[in-house]
A protein has these predicted regions:
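C-terminal, surface-exposed recognition/capping segments
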Residues: 1-167
Length: 167
């Protein structure tokens, strides 16, 4: 864990990565298994209702509303894959990372990403531009980076994330 002098410590690698410049694995929000293709139809928390898809967990508005807005540990990929002392950041913790660190585009081991340096203590982490995965597979590697938080957005079809581009 890297101490950036913020409210939480940050991992030195992505989930599934060995080195900081490794992309790691891709996951849908609230899922703990990676896939080669990501669609609404194969999303863990959707259920087919004829022609429609219905969200069945982490729902704040529908008929299955459970009003859960933070991932449970069993649905938090960092907790499941990295161990019980790990979890994904909350939206507020991600905001703190953005606001209390200096972000600089760098290349590390041939991989573009951001060196995120704490304005509090000078320690840093590297966040690779790992892109994303969708119905067409992996996209925008070395161009963009997207990182989930544990926090559900007000619309249950969306979750808070932080993202960046090479520009």
């Amino acid at each position: 864990a890297v101490d950036l002098g913020l409210s939480v410590k940050w991992a030195s690698t992505n989930v599934g990565a060995v080195y900081p410049e490794d992309f790691g694995d891709y996951y849908a929000w609230g899922e703990t298994k990676s896939k080669s293709v990501y669609t609404y139809e194969n999303y863990r928390w959707y259920e087919s209702a004829g022609e429609l898809l219905d969200i069945i967990k982490y729902d704040t508005k529908g008929e299955n509303a459970d009003n859960k807005t933070i991932l449970q540990k069993s649905d938090d990929v960092a907790n499941v894959k990295m161990g019980r002392f790990w979890r994904m950041p909350t939206a507020n913790e991600a905001k703190e990372l953005v606001e209390k660190c200096h972000w600089e585009v760098v290349t590390r081991g041939g991989v573009k990403g951001y060196r995120v340096t704490s304005l509090v203590n000078g320690n840093s982490i590297f966040l690779p531009m790992a892109g994303y995965a969708d119905k067409n597979g992996e996209q925008d590697e070395n161009i963009r980076g997207f990182y989930w938080t544990t926090s559900l957005y007000t619309d249950p079809l969306k979750a808070y994330f932080f993202g960046f581009t090479k520009d």
